[in-house]
Amino acid sequence: MSEYLFTSESVSEGHPDKVADQVSDAILDAILAQDPKARVAAETLVNTGLCVLAGEITTTAQVDYIKVARETIKRIGYNSSELGFDANGCAVGVYYDQQSPDIAQGVNEGEGIDLNQGAGDQGLMFGYACDETPTLMPFAIYYSHRLMQRQSELRKDGRLPWLRPDAKAQLTVVYDSETGKVKRIDTVVLSTQHDPSIAYEELKNAVIEHIIKPVLPSELLTDETKYLINPTGRFVIGGPQGDCGLTGRKIIVDTYGGAAPHGGGAFSGKDPSKVDRSAAYACRYVAKNIVAAGLATQCQIQVSYAIGVAEPTSISIDTFGTGKISEEKLIALVREHFDLRPKGIVQMLDLLRPIYSKSAAYGHFGREEPEFTWERTDKAAALRAAAGL
């Protein structure tokens, strides 16, 4: 029987790029809490002893950006110079400008050529869902995120006190070529930052027994499963001391782990007028509801926009041969049941709220948090009825 392999990865909240994402989204949330109509594009750079805040922000909110950045870094766990990055001791520079008026007139409702709220930029976005996991996410990315959440949990509650914030996980999964179903887990790679005092064998055994095995489905772990734990043998220097971190560099981790295409636009630090973020969330909402409705077991949707124009310039759907109705009919249902104009998306998903910090680590999709409206399946019944199933 033929098989194929597929791999996805996740990173922890202490990974330098994720530190940057979380600072950017914490600043976005602090602004939206006071000014829901703010225009925010908050970028962050973190390096040894340094946090740089830059980008474009137009708002009436009064926010202590330096305080927000320090509190976020401290919450992640970088609270000591021994870790190479200290929330209280690092220098924080603030270099924000305002949104370009040329862009603003295309986004502000009633201005520009299109009197509806136009898209904040041109671009293409994808959404995806499949029936491999309970939250309709691909297997490898879903469980890679769960491994990283487990690492954080054991670090913060003190059960494995030698863990440090920076970590990465990677899963290679074996699929049956005929059924397309997961057969077993081939390889688990998990690298975690640690105190210098811990012996390698003790670390390896603890990671396998306390992080990996409680998370991954036991029936998919076999005698052939390979465990690669801190493969270099040592991971003491990490976080922003080990690598420079930037907002928006983990876009595949943030989405579907490579199981679906990506339009290229990052999420964190962007208010919902930026379709890079809001339309990608809407695409996930559409795809998840199509799969939840039983109209397909796998669904990928692409939408595209032009700056300053409200209506999408294209909508396309691929169900990879699993659809119960044609893709043309699915597109018609999407147009009928989902408003994919920027303002329609914001209203449909209630996005003008300070809900984004939680999304900045462990994936934007496949987590059924109460704030994550794009994970609801409240349109599934209507879609199924409209399809005549």
Swiss-Prot record:
InterPro entries: ADOMET_SYNTHASE_CS, S-AdoMet_synt_C, S-AdoMet_synt_central, S-AdoMet_synt_N, S-AdoMet_synthetase, S-AdoMet_synthetase_sfam. Pathway: Amino-acid biosynthesis; S-adenosyl-L-methionine biosynthesis; S-adenosyl-L-methionine from L-methionine: step 1/1. It is an enzyme of class 2 (transferase). HAMAP family: S_AdoMet_synth1. GO terms for biological process: one-carbon metabolic process; S-adenosylmethionine biosynthetic process. SUPFAM superfamilies: S-adenosylmethionine synthetase. It comes from the Bacteria. K(+) binds at residue 43. GO terms for cellular component: cytosol. Catalyzes the formation of S-adenosylmethionine (AdoMet) from methionine and ATP. The overall synthetic reaction is composed of two sequential steps, AdoMet formation and the subsequent tripolyphosphate hydrolysis which occurs prior to release of AdoMet from the enzyme. It is found in: Cytoplasm. ATP binds at residues 15, 166-168, 234-235, 243, 249-250, 266, 270. Gene3D superfamilies: 3.30.300.10. One of its GO terms (molecular function) is ATP binding. Residues 99-109 are annotated as: Flexible loop. This is S-adenosylmethionine synthase. NCBIfam families: metK (TIGR01034). L-methionine binds at residues 56, 99, 243, 274. It comes from Neisseria meningitidis serogroup B (strain ATCC BAA-335 / MC58).
